[in-house]
A protein has these predicted regions:
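Conserved functional micro-motifs across diverse proteins
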Residues: 55-56
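Sec-dependent signal peptide cleavage junction
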Residues: 20-39
Length: 455
């Protein structure tokens, strides 16, 4: 019995000793880690050490001027950390040493009295929102070592009027200069290939931008709401133009898409109310929805051969457009493509056209005649509704589908020819066609909709 008691005591002692040793080991490890990452103070600055390098993490409240040293107690200062000076609202001047290689996210964000910043010659990257919301920042100079700008770096810097970007800059995130309302001119360095989404969105005084020859992509909303931008030369290397890239650029007067462009997003030039000329060339197969909608001064459009489809509402409410020739490669016209083009007098439909979408020419009141191509199969709802100047509609034998209200309100329509392939006339197809004296119904017609001929 005593033998078992002694064995039990020994086992318990072993377990306790092992636990103590593990706790001690963990304690040493934890203390060691804490010591290496502990925040320390140097004057008004706080910093931490990483592998012998110092990272600035903050400063005392109320500081108005900062001179960041190149080294602290022999350790080189290589970084300004994330949120290091976030909302230091009394900070007015900062001096950065060449030893700083990176500036962290939101490092100076919200420093509303900071007026000028020079990013040192050794800095390679400036992270997201580093200077965002610095509303009194007037000038920013980036040293030629800077290769990367994160997103929203200067977003909301509404006093920023002068920017000098690094000659070696390669990548820019989105929204870099969003809502920089004092910015007037910018030259993008030659190595930048992609202009990020919303880069200059809301730059209400921006009138001149130089894009690099090697740029291949302009992403969504890049120049949205830049009303002072009157002209821009797109580089020949450009292949992609994103959603709403120039939307609401109400001062833009002309645009020409380069030969290499293969993709144009929806609303690319929507509401460019001063746009008078547009040339779409190159390898674009499909043009985005609402691409030129509400471009009220657009009078001249050139569409290149190779297009297969015109997007919905592409020229919606382009009230100054008088004539357009659609390339023979186009087989489909989308919904509301020319709806509301009240000055449109002449349109040349492509020989390979098979489908006209609903509302495609709705309320084109100046359109007097349309030559329908021989391959046309269907015409969508209200496609020519409200075309009060249209005098005749001679459909080819291939047309077998008419939507409802196709010619509703065509008050000048006097002559109509319908294909025998049509089996149904939808409701109000010829309603209010008051000058139409007679019509020969298709041989295969089985259904006439409600109010089809009501006048």
């Amino acid at each position: 019995m005593k033998w078992w008691k002694k064995l039990l005591v020994l086992l318990v002692a072993g377990v306790v000793c092992g636990a103590i040793m593990r706790v001690m080991a963990l304690g040493v490890s934890k203390n060691t880690l804490s010591a290496s990452a502990a925040e320390q103070t140097y004057g008004d600055l706080t910093y931490v050490l990483h592998n012998g390098n110092a990272e600035i993490t903050g400063c005392a409240a109320g500081v108005t001027a900062l001179e960041i040293p190149a080294e602290i107690d022999g350790s080189p200062v290589t970084a300004v950390g994330d949120s290091a000076f976030l909302k230091q609202q009394k900070l007015q001047t900062v001096s950065l040493p060449d030893s700083v290689q990176s500036i962290g996210s939101q490092a100076f964000s919200g420093c509303i009295h900071l007026q000028e910043i020079t990013v040192s010659a050794g800095t390679q990257s400036v992270s997201n929102s580093a200077f965002s919301g610095c509303t009194n920042l007037e000038k920013a100079v980036l040293g030629d070592s800077v290769e990367t700008l994160g997103s929203s770096v200067f977003s909301g810097c509404e006093s920023l009027a002068e920017v000098q970007l690094s000659a070696n800059l390669q990548k820019m995130g989105g929204s870099v200069f969003q809502n920089c309302t004092a910015l007037k001119t910018v030259a993008i360095p030659e190595q930048v290939q992609t202009l990020g989404g919303s880069t200059f969105s809301g730059c209400s005084r921006l009138y001149q931008v130089t894009l690099p020859a090697k740029m291949t992509e302009i992403q969504s909303r890049a120049f949205e709401d830049c009303p002072k931008l009157e002209t821009i030369t797109l580089p020949e290397s450009l292949t992609t133009l994103g959603y709403g890239a120039f939307q609401n650029c109400s001062g833009l007067q002309n645009i020409s898409l380069p030969e290499q462009v293969t993709e144009v997003g929806d609303y690319a030039f929507a509401h460019c109310t001063a746009l008078e000329q547009a040339a779409v060339s190159g390898n674009v197969l499909t043009l985005g929805k609402n691409m030129f909608c509400d471009c009220r001064r657009l009078a001249e459009v050139t569409l290149a051969e190779g297009l297969t489809e015109l997007g919905n509402s592409m020229f919606l409410d382009c009230v100054s457009l008088q004539a357009v020739t659609i390339p023979d490669s186009v087989s489909q016209i989308g919904e509301s493509t020319f709806s509301g083009c009240t000055d449109l007098q002449h349109v040349t439909l492509p020989q390979n056209l098979k489908q006209i979408g609903g509302n495609a020419f709705r309320n084109c009141s100046s359109l007097t005649a349309v030559a329908f191509p021989e391959k046309l199969k269907s015409i969508g709802n209200e496609a020519f509704s409200g075309c009060s100047g249209l005098q005749e509609a001679l459909l080819p034998d291939t047309t077998d589908t008419l939507g409802y209200s196709v010619f509703y309100g065509c008050t000048s329509l006097e002559r109509v020819w319908l294909s025998d392939e049509i089996t149904e006339l939808g409701q109000t197809v010829f309603r209010q066609c008051k000058k139409l004296p007679e019509i020969t119904l298709p041989k295969n017609l089985t259904t006439i909709g409600e109010s089809t001929f009501f006048s």
